[in-house]
From Swiss-Prot:
This is Peptide chain release factor 1. Pfam families: PCRF (PF03462), RF-1 (PF00472). It comes from Alteromonas mediterranea (strain DSM 17117 / CIP 110805 / LMG 28347 / Deep ecotype). Methylated by PrmC. Methylation increases the termination efficiency of RF1. GO terms for molecular function: translation release factor activity, codon specific. Belongs to the prokaryotic/mitochondrial release factor family. One of its GO terms (cellular component) is cytoplasm.
Amino acid sequence: MKESVVRKLEHLVERFEEVQALLGDPEVIGDQDKFRNLSKEFSQLEDVVAGFNAYQQAQENLASAQEMLNEDDAEMREMAQEEMKEAKGEIERLETELQVLLLPKDPNDDNNCFLEIRAGAGGDEAAIFAGDLFRMYSRYAESRGWRVELVNANESEHGGYKEVVANVSGDGVYGVLKFESGGHRVQRVPETESQGRIHTSACTVAVLPEIPESEAIEINPAELRIDTFRASGAGGQHVNKTDSAIRITHLPTGLVVECQDERSQHKNRAKAMSVLQARLNQIEEEKRAAEEASTRKSLVGSGDRSERIRTYNFPQGRVTDHRINLTIYRLDEVVEGDLKQLVDPILQEHQADLLASLSDE
């Protein structure tokens, strides 16, 4: 293992011991925010420290076995060689494990997120596809034990959505779903197509981390225009008799957020503000990323329509992820929510990219 990596690990052990001591301090115990943050840091460091301790023990075992090679007893030398083989295998395994544990973490990975799906080119067929995508993500979330809560839905007359926004909450939601941002293209024969011609339509997906109140960007109320209106679905379904739906316009950026899912105006306003916070935060993140001008490719899409990440080809039963050149012929399973076969390879590729950048340092 590189000397620089060992030094980094030694520093983390020192910090772990420091955090452990602080968690027993009555002053820290009395400060809920501080105690919560330190507890989180403690749990993040715990695995790294345990892995490094095991690594050091394996190094000691190797050194002891090497000393035994000098023994006169042939049986002892044979035992030493066996122990050396075991220790080297353990060291190799732990080195890989520790490198993964040292990878830079996206601070938002554990956050809940907002999932936004918008119909693009393709008219009614694109809106139907947006509905299919929303159903696919909802099923996937259900399989992970996550909760999906509708924030706003602009339904299409022929089914599906022109736009749908939902909040997804649960363990590590953003860290997994963030790779879904980008352009999704569908190729299939619409039900209304009498000639059997394949149509191509598209949707854009944007995944934004939900920002905790303590980290929220301060928004000047004077920079907001808030309108109320009556909620309604396509063809007048779910019509509310009161003006409970909310539209918030952030004047400096022109961002517009609507929420009409709840019957309470107060709840709709709170949800809309959360979405606005997430979008403003995304703008800041994109600015920061542009300033850093990172040369390393990013697998996390911007939600831009031009950035096509995946194609769903129904006649061939095929799904292709263009970022990692992965094609699978299990479209039926994917649209029913079995996204694991697409999500896992993307996460592995992302991890490999991070490991490569760590070894370059």
